[in-house]
Design a protein with these regions (language model features):
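Flexible mid-to-C-terminal extensions adjoining Fe-S/redox cofactors in radical SAM and related proteins
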Residues: 111-199
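Generic detector of isolated residues embedded in canonical secondary-structure elements
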Residues: 18, 48, 101, 147-150, ...
Length: 199
């Protein structure tokens, strides 16, 4: 609702040059659940954000939003620089997380004991531990929906956040927020690239 005011504050009061919006997702465990955005809200937010970022660029502001910047690089460079939004969830593949006891998890957002990949005290290599976990842990289930079949953004998304799905017991389902963000941001980015506003 206050995208412009938030960006004005970050750019002109705090003099930030970059930031990243992480949208609150539907989450049964979080008291902030009423702050969660749903598909129509995500489309509105993404379009407002893109409009304001374009306006700030026209005013000469040196400011970027991290999720949009990564998606632009996905299109322009295929750099796969984000382990979350460049080629689907890469938790356990391009990143792992450790707890205070040396247990290894596929992502810092997941701590279910059944999702543990292994331990730093095991003799197996991380590759062997991940391969074993990928055969049995729900975190690694592929995510697909009927609309994914012909989605032009599937390469980048691949169903979205696996941790979110585990917390909501939606294993194998897509992350609706990530899907809506991709369907709203990528077409706008292509338009901006074709108009010469992003290079």
């Amino acid at each position: 609702k206050y995208v412009k005011e938030i960006l004005d504050y970050f750019i002109y009061t705090l003099h930030l040059t970059s930031m990243k919006f992480n949208l609150v997702r539907d989450n049964d465990h979080a008291p902030e659940q009423k702050l969660a955005l749903y598909e129509e809200d995500v489309f509105w937010f993404a379009n407002e954000l893109m409009d304001y970022l374009q306006a700030y660029r026209c005013l000469g502001a040196n400011f970027s939003e991290g999720n949009i910047e990564v998606r632009a690089k996905n299109l322009l460079q295929r750099s796969n620089m984000s382990c979350c939004i460049s080629h689907g969830c890469q938790g356990g593949r391009k990143m792992v997380s450790f707890d205070h006891e040396g247990n290894i998890f596929p992502c810092e957002m997941i701590d279910f004991p059944e999702e543990k990949i292994g331990s730093i005290y095991e003799k197996d290599s991380i590759e062997i531990m991940v391969n074993k976990a990928a055969q049995q842990n729900k975190f690694f289930l592929p995510k697909k929906d009927e609309r994914c079949k012909e989605c032009p953004w599937w390469y980048y998304c691949q169903g979205g956040c696996s941790s979110r799905n585990r917390y909501l017991n939606r294993d194998g389902q897509i992350d609706e927020v990530e899907c809506a963000l991709n369907r709203s941001i990528y077409p706008r980015l292509i338009q901006e690239i074709l108009n010469g506003n992003i290079s």
